[in-house]
Amino acid sequence: MKLFYNGTDIYNDVSLNYCVHEMYAEKQADTLVLRFNDTKGIWSKWNPADGDVLRFTEGASDTGKMFLHSMKPENGLFTIRAMAMPKSGATRKSKSWAGVRFLQLGNEIAANHGLTFQNYGCTDQVYPYLRQESETDFALFSRLCTLEGCQMLIYDGKLLAYSEQYIEQQAVAGTLEVDENGNFTYQDNRSACFGSCEVTAGSFSGTFSAPDAKNTAVLRAKCIAEAQLRAPGLPASGDRVVLMSNSNAEAARFAKGLLRNANKYGHTGQFSKALLTGYAAASLLQLKTEKASAWNGPVFVYKVRHDFVGNKSTLYFRDLLEGY
């Protein structure tokens, strides 16, 4: 194991009794929580500061660049919480754009926070008018990604936007074998999915219907928070900003994105086993389950939790959503 603090490996100089790294494919920044035995108050003497850079590596696992967000000395212990998102990402702003493009906005937001921007399959849509009103840059961009059937994540100093359908069409990165030595739980909530979505935003409206839909329920969401199924291990979106649209075509496109956001977590699972450092969020794996073969097939990993001190990993995954 290696723990870098502002570029220096301090692992052998500290007594680490808790180390959990959580990686997310969407809607939540990666977190790293470290707790040290510190009966002599050494950490406070080192004067750690918000924004300091940490990085933890173990085997094939690498947190990438993480920024210190909070610290807490308590009863001979010292706890640090770091995130992949820079501290500046919590700043609320207000701004408007005319004729801005999707990739232009991604590059602008990344630059605002000292990040670089990378795109994986997202269409460079144009927005005649876009408004940010007392919210963070990443909240705005995450909403826009969701409406376009995309998602964003931050890793190692990079803001990444990816089309979910594009990623789901790639080859699997490896195999996840669920055997008798691991604990697994699968959930089938597809009966709660929707057959179509209608978006009405001001004077514009649009509809999208899922191909070969087995459900007839219609989703009429006014915000992101109204277009989601609860996913194990993933916090529910609290985004209640009322949707805006510039045309009927844009409203129909947003309806497609919202329907995907609501339906993609209809079939989920999670698997825990001794530390599995070779797995990361936002990857495709081939699932093989010895005692539940009906669930076998390609899955999308939307969260990975590594407990390095407890020697345990938990992977959260969902089925691929076909057709949209």
List the model feature ranges, each with a label.
Residues 44-56, 91-100, 283-288:
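Extended Gly/Ser/Thr-rich low-complexity repeat segments
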Residues 121-193:
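Short beta-strand-centered interaction patches in the first periplasmic/extracellular domains
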Residues 69-77, 134, 165-167, 298-310:
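Short, compositionally biased
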Residues 17-42, 47, 182-324:
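An acidic/polar, Gly/Ser/Thr-rich interaction patch typically located in mid-to-C-terminal regions
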Residues 1-89:
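Assembly/oligomerization scaffold segments
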Residues 29-31, 74-79, 156-160, 310-314:
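A generic structural signal for beta-strand entry/edge sites
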Residues 78-94, 311-324:
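Short solvent-exposed strand/turn elements
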Residues 86-108, 118-143, 147, 168, ...:
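Short acidic/polar beta-strand-loop edge motifs in secreted extracellular
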